């Protein structure tokens, strides 16, 4: 599909055409990952130049969005939240894809450090990941690192626990506002 804005359920979604970066060979994945940043910046500038966001959520992989995050954070004076799914490039070293002495490692490690610096908050998948990130990145303020798991165990609740709208009122969320759960 070409790059463009689509409507779905009342939400405007910017779809960006990219190279294949999943389930492909390492060369295509590498080139595609490096091109993502410029493809997203171009699409955002073309389709959402006048749109303002208060919060920018982004996840890893990829870690190659530094310029996108820096540009948008400055343009909108937005808060940024990194959802850290993979600790890259260390996981590539662990998988034997390249060594810590390689040019690729140094390049991606530099991008990783800059992404952490740009992020107002960093959500890690587990307490162990939080510890790892802080141990290997002493420049990060521990106050901005927290646990943000992919899922949580659901608690059984009785259907009649709360009256409709009670939680929204409790959280000071206007009932007329659209609510997104990510």
What do the predicted segments below correspond to?
Residues 21-28, 51, 73-110, 155:
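Acceptor-binding helix/loop patch of EC 2.4 sugar-transfer enzymes
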Residues 29-45, 53-78, 82-91:
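An aromatic- and histidine-rich active-site surface loop
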Residues 128, 148-151:
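Carbohydrate-associated surface elements
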Residues 64-67, 71-76, 103-122:
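Membrane-proximal helix-turn-helix segments that form the acceptor-binding/catalytic region
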Residues 134, 138, 143, 151-169:
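Acidic anion/phosphate-binding donor-loop and adjacent secondary structure
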Residues 54-55, 121, 179:
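Structural motif
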Residues 166, 173-182:
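Conserved donor-binding/catalytic core segment of Leloir-type glycosyltransferases
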Residues 1-47:
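A conserved catalytic-core segment of Leloir-type glycosyltransferases
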């Amino acid at each position: 599909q070409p790059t463009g804005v689509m409507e779905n359920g009342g939400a405007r979604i910017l779809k960006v055409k990219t190279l294949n970066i999943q389930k492909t060979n390492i060369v295509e994945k590498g080139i595609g990952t490096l091109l993502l940043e410029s493809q997203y910046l171009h699409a955002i500038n073309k389709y959402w130049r006048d749109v303002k966001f208060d919060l920018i959520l982004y996840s890893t992989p990829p870690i190659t969005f530094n310029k996108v995050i820096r540009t948008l954070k400055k343009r909108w004076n937005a808060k940024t939240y990194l959802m850290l799914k993979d600790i890259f490039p260390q996981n590539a070293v662990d998988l034997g894809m390249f060594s810590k002495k390689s040019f690729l490692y140094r390049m991606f490690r530099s991008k990783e450090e800059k992404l952490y610096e740009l992020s107002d908050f960093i959500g890690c998948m587990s307490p162990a990941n939080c510890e790892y990130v802080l141990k290997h990145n002493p420049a990060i303020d521990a106050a901005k690192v927290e646990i943000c798991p992919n899922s949580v165990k659901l608690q059984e609740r009785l259907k009649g626990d709360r009256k409709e709208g009670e939680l929204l009122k409790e959280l000071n969320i206007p009932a007329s506002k659209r609510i997104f759960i990510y």
